[in-house]
Amino acid sequence: KKLHRTRSNILNYEQLVKFTHKSQSVACQGCNNHCSLTINTFNDGTRLVAGNKCDKMVHRVETKKEELPDLYKIKTDMLNAQKKKFSHDKKIGMPLVLNNYDLLPFWTRFFDSLGYEIVWSTPSTKEMYHSGQQSIPSDTACFPAKVVHGHIQQLIDKGMDVIFYPCMTYNVDEHQSDNHYNCPLVAYYPEVIAANMDFDKTKIVYPFISFDDNATFAKAIRMHFEKVGIHFNEKDIIIAKNAAMNEYEAFH
């Protein structure tokens, strides 16, 4: 009565006799999440969708794919272009893993200023993971850390004389929080690599560095590269670091 209806919406006897119900499980194709949906179809053609986490299938909301940029592809293309930006005869290997994805523009520019080209490992594959699997010391590490072993093995197999993979307690300070720690695995996995892999004739350089202080950064880089027969001047290192930070900020 309050709704001013002349009759109830509850099914009457005749409708109940004719009532049928069909249930079907499908994977939603509305986006990459592919939610598991249960579609209930009734004899009058109406449907009830259950399991949905959004309204796309309920209200048939369609999003044109061309309106959604592929941000992953855009960033990957930018990183690939950055890799090819500098070229030198002298080369140093670096694994394209963990925080090195974000720091790729920094390190390519940094070593370019010092007269070296970075040879990056290729994108991760199942075969790459298997190639370094035997040297993984703990199954508790995350997969992105485990696959580092395959990236390092690839650089060794390429015959790189030197691999650079620094330990970094802190990431770049973006001044958006009280601190800027790296995940412990990101920060110190180079030590795990150095202790558990057979480098044959390849030498690995894994200093503890921080971007927060030019003097300590330059000293660490100079001292650790001297151990493998590469000599850098600390003033040149600081100049290269400043140029690299400008490159990093321009990229991001």
Language model features by range: what are they?
Residues 1-252:
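An N-terminal assembly and electron-transfer interface module characteristic of large anaerobic redox
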